[in-house]
Amino acid sequence: MKKKKIIIFALLLGAIIVILVGWSVSRGKMYDYNYSEVAKKLETAPFNTNIPTKVPFEDMQLYDFGSNNQKVEFTLFNVDKEFLTVNILKDEIEYPKEIKKENIKIGRDVNGKYIPEHSGKRIILWQHGDLFYEIAFSYKLTPIEISKEQLIKMAESFK
């Protein structure tokens, strides 16, 4: 009887380890983004900008798009209702001083800021040329649904 309990415990422990390893591997994965719909919408935008070619979730689609003289904004989502909003502005994006911000590197030579939590979002900000970029992930339950590294990889994919 004792041997049977040990075998069951070992099997359960093994299953838990396999699930956790699989989750952590898939969590950091990036997916190619078919940006043709966003690129077509950008043809009418008031200024030229870069767009992401990689996203942290599979099958992201354009949900919303808007632009004016100072800003381009679009939101991507998928069937699991994971939302990413991209803002591209001519003016710097200001956040209150009391919000925790972390300095980050995007690629080799771009400095940015990472905000782990603000109003139900994880945010990354950076400047490229004369434009300011922001990616905001609206999480459903907790901020750990997306990692800082995934946001940085998405920022690095802007072309």
Regions found by a protein language model. Give the residues of each.
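Short hydrophobic beta-strand segments that form the core of ligand-binding sensory/regulatory domains
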Residues: 132-136
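Short, solvent-exposed recognition patches
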Residues: 28-123, 128-129
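N-terminal Sec-pathway targeting helices
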Residues: 1-17
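Surface-exposed amphipathic alpha-helical segments
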Residues: 138-159
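Short linear interaction motif-like sites in intrinsically disordered regions of transcription factors
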Residues: 1-2, 24, 127
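Membrane-interface motif at the C-terminal end of an N-terminal transmembrane signal
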Residues: 18-32
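A short, sequence-level motif marking secondary-structure junctions
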Residues: 14, 88-94, 138-141
